[in-house]
């Protein structure tokens, strides 16, 4: 095979020698030209140097011609080699003969397209050399693919679509549970909301409110998921405030995410560093943010954090690529090269799971209460000391103390369960900051109205009352008739027992309910309706204490 690939008898060493001679001739040309520049005004030296340049250029030209001739001579005729290999084989084994023909053709192809001289590998197999060449190309392709996958713009796009994939495949859609996708960039959404004179003149309001909640036969939305991370900029706060107005008008809670910049951080991996988060939010930079939290519409806004690992890095041991060998370069624990997504997708999946199981959406928090997020992507890598560690699939592990701080500040944190592939939402706090009253009852009502599980259920009652009473328009019903009708209807969702199990309470979300209907004095035939709802309270926190005594005291009354 070696002789057939080099029909002129030239060896690889001869071709290397010609290539080396050509490089030396080029170096001589450069040296001769330097001598001309150094000759100065001495005519004799300058003339001698110019003659040296001519000789060097001539020698270089001759060396190049010889090298080109040898290169052409070593390029074999592919078909001739293949035919010769088959004809001269003499081996009846068809597989072996075809192998020899394939080796010859591959060798000819490589010799024709590569500048380097062709040499057989130590094994003598041409397919082995081809494998080495393919591996080299795979490495080059992997570098290019790493640059694409780790580009910030591409990561944002991939994270959105993988988050949507996660939500769809973790939702039991049916005729009672539907997902709708509204494709619009943040810039388009901002333009729509800012150009509208009032929020109810925007296209978003028409899509969310008028076309469904405000239309006879429409299907009001239970909640909205906006795939964006809100920071502290004036643009983000302006859009968030207008989104809250739309959500409040349609009684449709808005789910979204908080950006690390909202906390003054570069990434959520730095979240454990600040000693006191409350102190950060009391600075002058957060004046507009604090003002937004005090508005009633902010109770319809929920911001989640930190992030979810949307996929494992590509690789043979994690997520193999079928078309070629690819090991994604993620550089250990550095978070920038991993694909992080919006945690609001996980909260939305908890909401749809609760509705599919119970028909209501109160059971969305707590590890055993419907807030568990399972089957997270856990990536394990080896450190320089040889120890195998797991990357936190929620980007950062949040302690109980920090989770309480975040909840008090109006955020819902996804808490990772150590040494597992599970996490859970324990808080149900919306962005709204409950006002403080002098009455304990008023303070309790304010805190309840700022929690997402209760708000989701209350919003659905508001949707039903409007849709159902719209059907009664034109009928001969008095205020007492309307009140009796609505109280009978709402009583079917009331469970008076406090000792019932969690599953029963999830199906009957109200502990008490009452509907008051009164006539509008200035508008005959029009009634005003006020609905009072008392949900089954969920465990928020538990303070435990231990006392060591020699004698047990009597139980406290």
Identify the meaning behind each predicted range.
Residues 1-9, 75-187, 192-194:
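N-terminal-proximal low-complexity accessory segments that begin disordered
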Residues 7-77:
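Extended amphipathic alpha-helical heptad-repeat regions
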Residues 140, 144, 160-167, 246, ...:
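Generic, well-ordered alpha-helical scaffold segments in large soluble proteins
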Residues 161-180, 191-216, 235-246:
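Core mixed alpha/beta domains of very large multi-subunit molecular machines
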Residues 325-481, 485, 541-544:
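Long, contiguous, structured domain-core segments that constitute the functional module of a protein
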Residues 481-506:
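Short, hydrophobic/π-rich interface segment
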Residues 514-557:
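C-terminal edge-of-domain segments
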């Amino acid at each position: 095979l070696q002789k057939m690939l080099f029909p002129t008898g030239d060896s690889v060493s001869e071709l290397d020698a010609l290539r080396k001679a050509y490089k030396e001739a080029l170096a001589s040309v450069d040296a001769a030209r330097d001598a001309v520049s150094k000759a100065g005004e001495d005519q004799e030296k300058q003339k001698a140097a110019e003659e040296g340049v001519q000789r060097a250029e001539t020698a270089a030209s001759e060396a190049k011609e010889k090298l080109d001739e040898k290169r052409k001579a070593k390029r074999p005729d592919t078909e001739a080699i293949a035919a010769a290999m088959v004809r001269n084989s003499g081996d009846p084994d068809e597989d072996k003969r075809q192998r020899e023909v394939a080796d010859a053709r591959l060798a000819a192809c490589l010799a024709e397209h590569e500048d380097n001289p062709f040499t057989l590998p130590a094994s003598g197999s041409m397919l082995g050399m081809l494998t080495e060449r393919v591996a080299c190309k795979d490495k080059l392709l992997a570098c290019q693919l790493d640059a694409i996958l780790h580009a910030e713009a591409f990561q944002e796009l991939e994270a959105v679509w993988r988050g949507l994939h996660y939500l769809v495949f973790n939702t039991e859609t049916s005729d009672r549970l539907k997902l709708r996708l509204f494709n619009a960039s943040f810039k388009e959404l901002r333009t729509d909301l800012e150009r509208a004179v009032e929020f109810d003149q925007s296209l978003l309001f028409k899509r969310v409110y008028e076309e469904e909640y405000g239309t006879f036969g429409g299907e009001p939305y239970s909640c909205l998921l906006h795939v964006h991370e809100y920071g502290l900029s004036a643009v983000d706060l302006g859009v968030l405030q207008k989104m809250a107005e739309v959500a409040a008008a349609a009684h449709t809670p808005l789910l979204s995410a908080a950006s690390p910049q909202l906390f003054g951080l570069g990434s959520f991996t730095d979240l454990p560093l600040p000693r006191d988060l409350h102190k950060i939010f009391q600075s002058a930079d957060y004046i507009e943010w604090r003002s937004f939290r005090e508005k009633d519409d902010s109770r319809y806004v929920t911001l989640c954090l930190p992030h979810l690992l949307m996929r494992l890095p590509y690789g043979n041991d994690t997520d193999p690529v079928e078309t070629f060998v690819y090991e994604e370069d993620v550089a250990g624990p550095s978070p920038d090269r991993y694909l992080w997504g919006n945690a609001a997708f996980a909260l939305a999946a908890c909401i749809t799971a609760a509705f599919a199981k119970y028909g209501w959406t109160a059971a969305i928090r707590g590890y055993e209460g419907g807030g568990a997020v399972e089957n997270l992507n856990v990536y394990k890598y080896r450190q320089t000391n040889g120890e195998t560690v797991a990357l936190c699939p929620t980007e950062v592990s949040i302690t109980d103390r920090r989770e309480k701080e975040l909840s008090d500040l109006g955020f819902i944190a996804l808490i990772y369960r150590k040494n597992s592939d599970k996490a859970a939402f324990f808080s149900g706090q919306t962005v709204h900051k409950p006002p403080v009253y002098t009455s304990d009852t008023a303070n309790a009502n304010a805190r309840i109205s700022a929690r997402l599980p209760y708000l989701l259920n209350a919003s659905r009652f508001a949707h039903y009352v409007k849709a159902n009473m719209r059907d009664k328009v034109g009928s001969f019903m008095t205020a007492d008739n309307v009140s009796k009708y609505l109280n009978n209807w709402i009583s079917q969702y009331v469970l008076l027992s406090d000792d019932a199990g969690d599953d029963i309470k999830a199906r009957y979300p109200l502990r008490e309910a009452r509907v008051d209907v009164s006539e509008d004095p200035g508008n005959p035939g029009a009634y005003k309706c006020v609905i009072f709802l008392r949900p089954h309270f969920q465990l928020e926190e538990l303070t435990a204490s231990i006392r060591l005594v020699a004698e047990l005291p009597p139980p406290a009354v």
